[in-house]
């Protein structure tokens, strides 16, 4: 069986943490900030962790990522 290839689009969007988790960026940060409060914008700047329910699927896509 051939090696699994890394899903390159996913590899660019996620970073692995030291404990094996995955960091991601928040959605809704591209444009139209006038409708969001300062607090919302500040919190959206910080990275978030991938939820446990999505971990298995995403880890398979980025299996070769280090």
Swiss-Prot record:
Organism name: Lactobacillus acidophilus (strain ATCC 700396 / NCK56 / N2 / NCFM)
Keyword Ribosomal protein among UniProt keywords: yes
Extent of the signal sequence: none
NCBIfam families: rpmI_bact
Family, similarity comment: Belongs to the bacterial ribosomal protein bL35 family.
Keyword Ribosomal protein: yes
GO cellular component term of the entry, any: cytosolic large ribosomal subunit
Name this protein carries in UniProt: Large ribosomal subunit protein bL35
Region of interest: Disordered: 1-52
Cited PROSITE patterns: RIBOSOMAL_L35
Domain of life: Bacteria
A GO MF term: structural constituent of ribosome
Gene name as annotated: rpmI
Compositional bias of kind Basic residues: 1-46
Keywords from the UniProt entry: Ribonucleoprotein, Ribosomal protein
């Amino acid at each position: 069986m051939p090696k699994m290839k890394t899903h390159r689009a996913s590899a660019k969007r996620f970073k692995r943490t030291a404990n094996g988790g995955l960091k991601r960026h928040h959605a809704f940060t591209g444009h139209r900030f006038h409708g969001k409060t300062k607090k919302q914008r500040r919190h959206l700047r910080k990275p978030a962790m991938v939820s446990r329910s999505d971990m298995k699927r995403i880890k398979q896509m980025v299996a070769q990522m280090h």
